[in-house]
């Protein structure tokens, strides 16, 4: 936003000024490189998807919101291994309730959620997690993290109960520390150590903790809701690369984002949600943003 409004832009990184530029003489790519300290690719690099067997099939799904109002109205969709399916739309059109139903956080009123042939519509979040379904929630503070716990405790939230991190309910603290520190380095979580409470981190680094925990578990299906919210541009690039790599390794990814650019760049197919329904399926390579804007407003003809 600064780029479009300001005459001059000062870039700071790690507490130091990296450069002062006239916006009329500087590209967004140059500013991004100064922000990160290396070359940044703003376009997502990926090959054509090669979808195979169906992982998730949602049939006639109805979901009510916390007020008892219908938020998801007869949604049908499928996701195959080896593809990224995106959901686009103005926030408040049922995306939140759809994700909550898929992850067991909200009970569906009607319909089926078939995961590898099993209906998980009535499953608890705990059981869904144990089926190798990862979830990056849109609200990291209230849903994605326990801010009263340490960084390492949040990082092992999906794996604390199994080997090699624990055996018969007893932590192997050496292996826990090794695991947490590896994720800290791999995902560039900026903190002196993993023993600090996660609430001491910036919002962007808190998001990195969530992403690190979810993407490090080799999930079969990843449900990513606003996965890059509050993250710096270099780590946005890294998260996009990780989602594409998961696809290329045979995983299935559902990407829900309020950032239209993100959905269009990362997803292989995009469903547009409007008033609780998926009103249009598109190939992001075959539509432009003006067309998407009309679809997001409910204009499909």
Model-derived regions, located:
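Glycine-rich phosphate-binding loops of nucleotide-dependent enzymes
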Residues: 1-301
């Amino acid at each position: 936003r600064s780029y479009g409004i300001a005459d001059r832009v000062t870039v700071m990184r790690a507490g130091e000024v990296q450069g002062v530029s006239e916006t009329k003489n500087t590209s967004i790519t140059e500013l991004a490189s100064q922000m990160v300290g290396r070359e940044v690719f703003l376009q997502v690099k990926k090959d054509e998807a090669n979808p195979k067997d169906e992982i998730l099939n949602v049939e006639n799904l109805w979901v009510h919101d916390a007020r008892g109002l219908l938020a998801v109205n007869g949604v049908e969709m499928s996701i195959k291994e080896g593809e990224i399916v995106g959901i686009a739309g103005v926030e408040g059109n049922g995306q939140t309730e759809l994700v909550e139903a898929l992850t067991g956080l909200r009970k569906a009123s009607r319909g089926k959620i078939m995961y590898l042939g099993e209906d998980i519509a009535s499953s608890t979040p705990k059981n869904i997690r144990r089926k190798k379904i990862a979830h990056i929630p849109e609200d990291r503070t209230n849903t994605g993290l326990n801010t009263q716990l340490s960084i390492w405790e949040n990082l092992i939230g999906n794996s604390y109960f199994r080997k090699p991190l624990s055996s018969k309910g007893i932590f192997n603290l050496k292996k826990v520390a090794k695991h947490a520190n590896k994720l800290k380095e791999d995902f560039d979580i900026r903190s002196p150590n993993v023993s600090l409470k996660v609430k001491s981190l910036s919002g962007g680094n808190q998001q990195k903790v969530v992403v690190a925990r979810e993407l490090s578990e080799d999930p079969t299906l990843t449900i990513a809701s606003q996965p890059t919210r509050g993250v710096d541009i270099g780590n946005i690039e890294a998260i996009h690369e990780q989602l594409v790599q998961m696809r290329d390794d045979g995983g299935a990814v559902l990407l829900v984002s309020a950032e239209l650019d993100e959905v269009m760049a990362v997803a292989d197919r995009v469903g547009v949600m409007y008033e609780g329904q998926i009103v249009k399926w598109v190939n992001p390579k075959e539509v432009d943003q003006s067309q998407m804007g009309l679809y997001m407003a409910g204009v499909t003809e």
